[in-house]
Amino acid sequence: MALAIDDEIVTNDLAFDDEARIYVLTGPNRGGKSVITVALGAAQALTQLGLPVTATEAVISPVSAIFTHFPEGADDTIDKGRLGEECARLNDIFLKVTNRSLVLLDESLSSTGSFEASYIAAEVLGGLAHFGCRCLFSTHLHE
């Protein structure tokens, strides 16, 4: 059975190299940012397992680890609050990340105001740049 799609399919290209190791993907809520973030992680994992990916073309070099920071439920926020929980999970990533890692951040720091989130996000991205890892940070923040 063929799938009928009325809307035009939008393709995406990402190239991690010495010129660009960190991407910040912005846009409105429900604009597809999370889909791209998950698709990148899936393509990386599938390729490293020797499995095919859904792409016209894919050249993917191996990573030593894939770290994810996606919104979680409220279970761990009682003691620390949601921002504290997010920062604790970011700290866990920083303790393990290397220049051969892929870090996927999806709507990280959305538990606080845009000024504070932008400040913390800039520090996080600066730290990840220091490690030299590959990173995709999808956010609704525009600052």
Write out the residue ranges for each language-model feature.
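ATPase nucleotide-binding head domains, primarily ABC-like/P-loop NTPase cores
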Residues: M1-E143
